[in-house]
Amino acid sequence: MVKTYAFGFPKLGEKREFKRLLENYWKGKISQEELIKGMEELNLWRANLYRENVEIIPSNELSYYDFMLDTTVMVGAIPSRFGEYRGLDTYFEMARGKNALELTKWFNTNYHYLVPELEGENFKLLINRPLEDYKFFKEKGINTVPHVIGLFTFLKLSKAPKRVEEEGLPVIILEKLDTKERLEKFTKALLPVYKELLESLKNEGVNRVHFEEPALVTDLEDYDWEILNEIYSELSKVGVDLGILTYYDSVSDYDKFVNLPVKALHFDLVSNEENLKNIKEKGFPEDKELIAGIINGRQPWRANLREKVKLLEELLKVSANLVVSNSCPLYHLPVTVEPEDELPEGLKERLSFAKEKLREIRLIKEALEGKEEALREVESSEKVMTAVFAQNPEVRRRLASLSEKDFQRELPYKERDKIQRDILKLPLFPTTTIGSFPQTEDVRKMRTAYRTGKISEEEYKNFIKQKIKYAIEVQEDIGLDVLVHGEFERSDMVEYFAIKLDGIATTKHGWVLSYGSRVYRPPIIYGDVSRPAPMTLEEITYAQSLTNKPVKGMLTGPVTILNWSYYREDVPKREIAYQIALALLDEVKDLENAGIKVIQIDEPAFREGAPLKKRDWPEYFDWAVKAFRLASRAKPETQIHTHMCYSEFNEIIEYIYQMDFDVISIEASRSKGEIIEVFEKFKGWDRQIGIGVYDIHSPAIPTKEEMKAIMLRAMKVLPKELLWVNPDCGLKTRRWEEVIPALRNMVDMAKELREEVGVKV
């Protein structure tokens, strides 16, 4: 018999109730009691949606900020700087206070989690949220399966203090548990807490618990599997049925995974075909339940239900204990497609957000049982999802005609560099910014007024021009060498281009949580991508008309647009990336023809889109590098910049070099310039590097001395002729009164540095 189950339904609410509750609480507009009551209502709303569609309902899913933070608090891993745990006050201090935990990407998704810091080895069951939530639903007559982040994944994503030497002095740094010894030590310390948790749930009548273990799809060592066996052997002794959920990729070792001592195993059968291949070829244990994640939890497309029913029929031949489910948590999707009334024609019927995915899970089971409504849906979904949609013959022709030369600049870097230096005549240590300037309240208000039709397009454009003029005046007064227009017309670096490109749709209500209460609306790449008209030309050329200094053209790169959007599944990602790249190349050509000499193509998502297993990296980086090269195939005299605002380059430096830009700007302030070592170790590095000398995430105004120290560090390992000076990221979230003195200090520091090395200013 087939059962139905879903997990990870978005907590945001159809009208972003979660966001409003949190932010009103933080602003002091509602009490803690009102916050809790509102969260309980959201929790019940989610549970009722589950009940309408699936038989197995999860609990302990509605975190007040982040599920990894919840687990950190649950096991009592409160760093000493936060003092005694004082309920929600400490909880939110750990999440968003002055000394908050580090925030980083959750695997290769666009969700962010708070990194646990394991200071000591004394842990305890501090807050038993899984038990509280189970009891909450039990009192309402709803039987649930508690969900908990698995101990192995929790440890793999945690950091602990480690003693290292820096310039001959002992220093304590936080590092991942990257050795067998460190992992074993903390497993031993935390396993009793997890056992106590299971005991408490068992005493309340819980007979099944699911542990989320996405770390099992990453590259694992043999000792990792030994530790996993130890964890689940111990936990299974409690006498509660255990399930392990894996997602985002195939499990790294099928044989070891299916032999773990648990009752149920969840497989992502969407991200690739390896899990399914292993299940069919190697079989599946008769005494275990196979949870088949066949409904895509990461992409918003309606399922071809005929294909899914057929797949389940195949799986039933392998396992009689079958559960149909989603491939990964549904919180990567908006709540529902229902209110979307401005999508391109024919698109809405092809979409399925979280609410619709729950219904699809139910329909698959009902179709297997031969129910008429479900069978009609099977037919309808197949008809819609197999029809040709949003194809552009001209885009296809351009793709088909691409050859190797389209992925190469006309001249090698060293020859381009000479030409560009002659044209730009920039001083040593040229100064610039990354692109955006403060988006103040008046900018947001005018954008909203324009979007809602309260002001005309002409009024809005005139307002943007005033802002650009002010930004140019400020930069000239400060003395920056290469200027930017400020990006006042852009609310989001991907959405801005998505709106202007054919083949990409934006939603009105398709909000997804990124972290805490922060939401975004991913664009949807639904068809062949092309550029019907120039996208940035008007603003950039206006800015350039106001100054004799070079103004950078500012584009978001093809890899980032793809990785931060939902994308179609009927063509390979490589092809989508090349389509976007060709559209951007058209923009580059227009900017060049308008006299723009410096063009920046930002790729912040270049690394984060990489597959979770390194064996899959060569294929990904091959098309990622080529997409950038295709978009940036400018004239030799045009200086191409790129920007990457993360600091872990070690593993991908070779791929970064292959991108063949002229200048790359990087974050260097938070790592105090340590990132420079990566470029030092790379033999033959000859590209220019913009050193991010101050942390834009802090309101503090950096001193000349602090910034100079980072530059001096860089000068020890890189030729001074290669170095630029810039902040580490865009200045959109800062205030003008912070930005102006910081940039003034930065420019003054660069001038002093030129004098110190004997160059006339």
Swiss-Prot record:
One of its GO terms (molecular function) is zinc ion binding. Belongs to the vitamin-B12 independent methionine synthase family. Binds 1 zinc ion per subunit. L-homocysteine binds at residues 434-436, 487, 602. Catalyzes the transfer of a methyl group from 5-methyltetrahydrofolate to homocysteine resulting in methionine formation. Its EC number is 2.1.1.14. It holds the Pfam family Meth_synt_2. GO terms for biological process: methionine biosynthetic process; methylation. Its cofactor is Zn(2+). Pathway: Amino-acid biosynthesis; L-methionine biosynthesis via de novo pathway; L-methionine from L-homocysteine (MetE route): step 1/1. CDD domains: CIMS_C_terminal_like (cd03311), CIMS_N_terminal_like (cd03312). Zn(2+) binds at residues 643, 645, 667, 729. 5-methyltetrahydropteroyltri-L-glutamate binds at residues 16-19, 105, 564, 608. The active site is at 697 (proton donor). The keyword Methyltransferase applies. It comes from Aquifex aeolicus (strain VF5). This is 5-methyltetrahydropteroyltriglutamate--homocysteine methyltransferase. Keywords: Amino-acid biosynthesis, Metal-binding, Methionine biosynthesis, Methyltransferase, Repeat, Transferase, Zinc. It catalyses: 5-methyltetrahydropteroyltri-L-glutamate + L-homocysteine = tetrahydropteroyltri-L-glutamate + L-methionine. L-methionine binds at residues 434-436, 487, 602.
